[in-house]
Amino acid sequence: MSEARRDSTSSLQRKKPPWLKLDIPSAVPLTAEEPSFLQPLRRQAFLRSVSMPAETAHISSPHHELRRPVLQRQTSITQTIRRGTADWFGVSKDSDSTQKWQRKSIRHCSQRYGKLKPQVLRELDLPSQDNVSLTSTETPPPLYVGPCQLGMQKIIDPLARGRAFRVADDTAEGLSAPHTPVTPGAASLCSFSSSRSGFHRLPRRRKRESVAKMSFRAAAALMKGRSVRDGTFRRAQRRSFTPASFLEEDTTDFPDELDTSFFAREGILHEELSTYPDEVFESPSEAALKDWEKAPEQADLTGGALDRSELERSHLMLPLERGWRKQKEGAAAPQPKVRLRQEVVSTAGPRRGQRIAVPVRKLFAREKRPYGLGMVGRLTNRTYRKRIDSFVKRQIEDMDDHRPFFTYWLTFVHSLVTILAVCIYGIAPVGFSQHETVDSVLRNRGVYENVKYVQQENFWIGPSSEALIHLGAKFSPCMRQDPQVHSFIRSAREREKHSACCVRNDRSGCVQTSEEECSSTLAVWVKWPIHPSAPELAGHKRQFGSVCHQDPRVCDEPSSEDPHEWPEDITKWPICTKNSAGNHTNHPHMDCVITGRPCCIGTKGRCEITSREYCDFMRGYFHEEATLCSQVHCMDDVCGLLPFLNPEVPDQFYRLWLSLFLHAGILHCLVSICFQMTVLRDLEKLAGWHRIAIIYLLSGVTGNLASAIFLPYRAEVGPAGSQFGILACLFVELFQSWQILARPWRAFFKLLAVVLFLFTFGLLPWIDNFAHISGFISGLFLSFAFLPYISFGKFDLYRKRCQIIIFQVVFLGLLAGLVVLFYVYPVRCEWCEFLTCIPFTDKFCEKYELDAQLH
C-alpha cells in the first residue's frame, strides 16, 4: 500500500511544472498553556486588528474540526410539519425567521407609533430615527492564540467599551445618541465576537430591485436605442466601491489598507472623518498618507483610559443612513490621546475599494420598516421608550422586509376591473341625491304616456347600482332566497294566475292583464271558463286563462299530450316555441297582435308585461320569447354572473369575496389604491404576503356577510371590511409593542381618531359601516392569531400559543354565527339603515323598500 502511494507521489512530481514551488508547513501541536475558552475561528480574517498592520499569519484548525460530523437521524414528517407550523405562527423556540420577524417588528414600531424608550435607542441601531447605538459597550474576553504560531499573547480591541460607560438617563428625548464607532473599511475581532457590535447589526444583503424599477430602466434603455443587457453591465462597471450585497457574504469584509485612525492625532483624525464624502471620488492627501505611515512606528507607548465623550465625538461624522451627522458647536475641547500598545496580525494583501465600503454602505442602506413605527408612525411622531431588553433588540435587528407582491397584484386587479366596468356600463349621474328622468313612452295599451325613471346618483363617478349588481356586488337577494323578495314574487304570480288576455275591439293588439286593467267598452277580456273558447282538461273546462299567443291546443313544442298535459295553473305553463296553426286559429287570444311581453325592472325581481320601448326606458330586461312573467326568472337576470342551480333559489355566495375587487367608481378606486400603497404595502413588507392576504380576504368576507345580514337590499362594492381589518392590524401591532413605546397612549388615541373619522365618513351613501365594524372586529381576531410579534420571555411565548388557538376559535365562532343569521335565521333591522346612511334630505339615501313603484 505504501509503495503504491509512493509511486503516485512520484508521478505527480514528474507532472509538476518546473516553475511551481510548493511549501506545505508542518502542523504545530497546541501547547497546554492555551486557555480553555479558546474558540476556533473559521475565518482567518477575524484575527486582523483595526489598529496596526502586521504580517499575514494563519492558525491551524483544531483537531476536532477535522473529524467527520456525527450522523444525525432524519426528522420525521410529523416533526417537520410541527416545526414549520410553529415557525409560520412565530412561536418556534429556535427559529431564525421568528427572530427576523421580531426585529423587523420593532423597526416598524419605531416608524409608525412614535418615539421609543431611551433604553431602546441605546441598544438599537434604527436608521429611521438617526440614532446611534451605545450597546457595544461590553468588552469580550481577549482571544488567546498559540504563541508558537503567532508570537503574541492576545488581541484586545480598544473600541469594545465596557459597561462603565453606560449611563441610565444620558439620552433625553429629542436627542440621539452617538453611533458605536465603526472604522470605515476595517473591522476587528471584537466587532464580530460581540453580539452587540455595531458592525454586527449591518444588514445582510440588500433586496433586489423591484420589477417596476427594472421595467422602467429597460424601457428607458430601449428608448435610447441601447440594449438592456449592455445598459445593465455598463452601470455595474462604473461602481467605485464594492457592492453592498457582497460585503459580508462573498468576502470577509476586511480592508486592504488597515485603518490607524484610533491612534492618530486629533487634528488628523478630525480631518479624516470630515472628508469621508470626498474619499468616494478623490484620493487621500499626501500629508494624511504620511501620518498614517508614521502611526505604526510608535508602538512602544503604553495605553491609558479612554474618555467616553471624546471617543463618541470622534465618530460623529460617520454616515447615518441618509446624510451626515456633524459635530455640535461649543463642544468641549478634546483631551490628548495616549498611545496604546497592541500587536496585530495582517491576513491578506491590499484589496482595492474596501476602505470606503462600510461608510458608503451605511449611507445607501435601504430603509427598513421598524416594528410599530411604519408610515403611520412617522405621521403620528412615535418613538420607542427609553429602556428595552437586549433580547428584544436583537429580535428587531434580524428582521428583513418582504416584497409586497399581494399589494401590487391587488392594485393592478382593482385598476383593471374599474376601468373595464366604467367602459362597459358607463357612468351614472354624479351626486348625492336621486336623479329623475321623465319622457313620453309608448306603453302596452297602444298610447303614449309620460313615465318617470328614478335612479340613485353616484358621487364616486362610476356605474349605477343595477350595473354593480350585475358585476358581482354584495346583494343578499342574489346570495340566498330572501323571504321578502320571494314573498313579493309569489304574490305577483298569484295575481297573474287570475289574469287573462285583453283583446281590443279595433284589433290593434292584445295584452295579458287583470280584469281591472282591461276596459270593458274598448276591449274584450277573454277569461276561461266564461269565454266559449275555453279548452278542456280531464273532461272539464280549464278554470284559469287565457294567455295571449299561447294555447295548449295549438302548441307543438312542447305539446300538451297525455301524460304530459299542461297543468291547470297558467303560471306553471312552459314557453311555447312552435305553434301548429299560425295566426288563423279562430281563437281571439291567438289571432291578435301581442303588444306586451314580460320585462324585469329594478333590482327586487319585479316583472311587468309591457312594451319594449317602456322596458328599454326603465333599463329593464325584455323577454321576447315569453308571454307570462312566471315563465322568466327576473332575479337571474338582475344578478347576472353564473346562473342559479335552481332558478327559484339564488345561490351566488361567492359575491362575499368577489365584491372585494369591485369599486363604485373612479374616486372609490383611487382611495383604495392610496390606502393599499401606504398602509397595506407597509404592513405587507413587515408580515409577508401570505399573512396579509389571509387577514385582508377573511376580514372582507366577514364584513360583507354582516352587511348582507343588516342591509340585505343595498348593493355594496369595495374592500371596506378588508381595509378596516388592516387597520385592526395596526392596533394589534400597537398592543404588542406597548412595552417598548415611549408614549403608547398617544399613539392609541391617534389611531382611534382615524378610525372614528372613517366611521363618520361611512354615514354617507355608498359607504357601508356594517362592513367597517365587522371587518375591524374580525381583523383584530385574525391579527392576534396570524401576526407574530415580539416575545418578552418564555411565558410570553406560551401565551402566544394560547392566543393563537383562542382567537382562531373566536373568529370561527363569529363567522359561523354570521352564516347562521344569514342563511338559517335571517333577521330584519329597521333602524340599521341609519347607522350607515343618515337621510339629511328625502332623496339623500337610496330607498330599500320592496314597493313596486320604487326601483
From Swiss-Prot:
Q: Which residues lie on this side of the membrane: Cytoplasmic?
A: 1-411, 677-691, 736-746, 794-803
A Gene Ontology cellular-component term = Golgi membrane
Q: Name one GO biological process term.
A: protein transport
| Location relative to the cell | Endoplasmic reticulum membrane; Golgi apparatus membrane
* Modification Phosphoserine, positions: 76, 176, 390
Q: What does this protein do?
A: Regulates ADAM17 protease, a sheddase of the epidermal growth factor (EGF) receptor ligands and TNF, thereby plays a role in sleep, cell survival, proliferation, migration and inflammation. Does not exhibit any protease activity on its own.
> Subunit structure, briefly?
Homodimer, or homooligomer. Interacts with TGFA and HBEGF. Interacts with EGF; may retain EGF in the endoplasmic reticulum and regulates its degradation through the endoplasmic reticulum-associated degradation (ERAD). Interacts (via cytoplasmic N-terminus) with FRMD8/iTAP; this interaction leads to mutual protein stabilization. Interacts with ADAM17/TACE.
Name it: Inactive rhomboid protein 1
The species this protein was found in: Homo sapiens
